[in-house]
Every structure is written in C-alpha cells, then in structure tokens.
Design a protein with these regions (language model features):
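Active-site entrance/lid segments in N-terminal catalytic domains of soluble metabolic enzymes
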Residues: 1-107
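Conserved active-site-proximal phosphate/metal-binding subdomains
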Residues: 95-109, 115-255
Length: 255
C-alpha cells in the first residue's frame, strides 16, 4: 500500500484469525492510520492502537456491542446487517443502523446489502454518516480476487446466497455452491465443529486466489444481485456519489 500512495490507508484485522495479534502489532510498526476490525472484540488491542494514533473502527452487530466499542475508545463503528457477506450477525441493516445511531455519539457507518446510490441514500436516512461496501468492491478492476470469483458475483441473482455455520455460532453468508451445500448437509446431520472446520479449511483461499468457485468459500452479500459490471474504484465511487445525490435530491423532503 505504501508503494501505491503517500495518502493514509486502512487495514482490516479479522480478530478470529490466529495471527490477529501479529497483524495488530504490524499496524503500529508500519504507521497505519486507520484500522477496521471484524469477527470479534478488539478491546485487547485498543489501548496500543490509540496510543499510536490509529483511528479504530470496529464492525458491530448489536447496540450493546456498539456501546461497548464507544466506551473502549472506538472512533466510529460499522453497523453491519445480516445481508452482508462473510461473518454476519442476527439483525438486518434496516433495523440495526438506526438503533445504533440512536445509541452512540460517535459516527455510524452502515454496511450490509448496500451496492448503489439507492442503498447509500437509504443508509443516510437511517442515521449513518457513511457506508461500507464489500461485495460491490470485490469485482472492482483493482481487486486482486480471482476473475472466476468476480464473474460468479456478477452472475449472482437475488436468491443465490445462503448462510452456513449457524450451528457453530459463527454464521457466514456465501454464494451457493458445492461446498456450501455439503456444509449445510453436514450441519443438518449434526456434524461436529471439528468436522465442519476440516471441510472449510483453506476454502476461502481456494475461491479468492485459486478461483475454485465450486469447492471454495464464495463470501458475498445479498447485494450481489445488484452487482452487474466491473469498473475501477474511481469510476465506482463517482457512480455511487452521483446515484446517492440523485436519490436525495429526488426525495419529496429535499429542500
């Protein structure tokens, strides 16, 4: 990232990963300015990050978690609904965002199911001050995700995602394929956590790096059905802003 820009950039730390502590330290050593966190509580890293001047923005799936993050020193929170891809909570974006916005004083960023100006404008109406999009940017031309993965997202329809891992307490939304069908079958038959973990070992890499869209984990949100073309990040952001402005200006309440 430093080779690409002299501007501030962010790093996402997945707290369930076994190397999370190592990544947390690298963030400090490399002078990263912004960190977003997911799949866990970043509390044990918060003091060190704040002392290093890092802006910390955790993903939250409940009002209680949002309040906890605010008390812990978070600069903002990402209220992520269950429409999102990857690890998800139990509430929808529509219900979660306004409740979190009412509960905390720090900025709220909406995530989950947002892929265009309509969703972005709706997020602002719900009380968010920004949005986070994953599925939409997965297919950006700058994304290093395998072309097969991108094509699968673009071809996805509104009902093509499903949730695996409910029995483990770590539900994950993915696009339906052979791996997800086998996972759900094993869950239904009462497979152990270890058996399910063995099935998914390395599955995300299979999809993202190797392009195996049959046996890999195709993490993507319900907004995949709205993603129909590839474009550069610059083009995408311009289109999003223009679309959002159009929706807001077209509102009967706009003055």
């Amino acid at each position: 990232a430093k080779k690409l820009t002299d501007k501030p950039f962010g790093v996402n730390v997945m707290l369930l990963n076994p190397n999370a502590a190592e990544v947390a330290q690298i963030v400090i050593e490399e002078g990263v300015k912004v960190v977003t966190t997911g799949a866990g509580n970043p509390g044990k890293f918060m003091d060190a990050w704040k002392q290093a001047g890092v802006v910390v923005i955790p993903v939250v799936a409940s009002v209680a978690m949002a309040r906890m993050m605010e008390r812990g020193g978070a600069d903002a929170v990402i209220a992520e609904g269950m429409e999102s891809g990857g690890h998800i909570g139990a509430q929808t974006t529509m219900t979660l965002v306004p409740q979190v916005a009412d509960a905390v004083q720090i900025p709220v960023i909406a995530a989950g199911g947002i892929a265009d100006g309509r969703g972005m404008a709706a997020a602002f109406m719900l009380g968010a001050e920004g949005v986070q999009m994953g599925t939409r940017f997965v297919v950006a031309k700058e994304s290093i995700v395998h072309p097969n993965y991108k094509e699968r997202v673009i071809k996805a329809k509104d009902i093509d995602s499903e949730v695996t891992g409910m029995s483990t307490g770590h539900p994950i939304r993915v696009l339906r394929n052979q791996m997800s069908r086998e996972y759900l079958k094993m869950e239904k038959e009462g497979a152990s956590f270890e058996e399910l973990e063995h099935l998914t070992l390395g599955s995300l890499r299979k999809a993202v790096i190797d392009g195996d869209v049959v046996n890999g984990s195709l993490m993507a949100g319900q907004s995949a059905g709205l993603v129909t073309e590839k474009m550069t990040c610059e083009m995408l952001i311009r289109k999003l802003v223009k679309g959002t402005e159009k929706q807001i200006r077209g509102s009967v309440f706009y003055e």
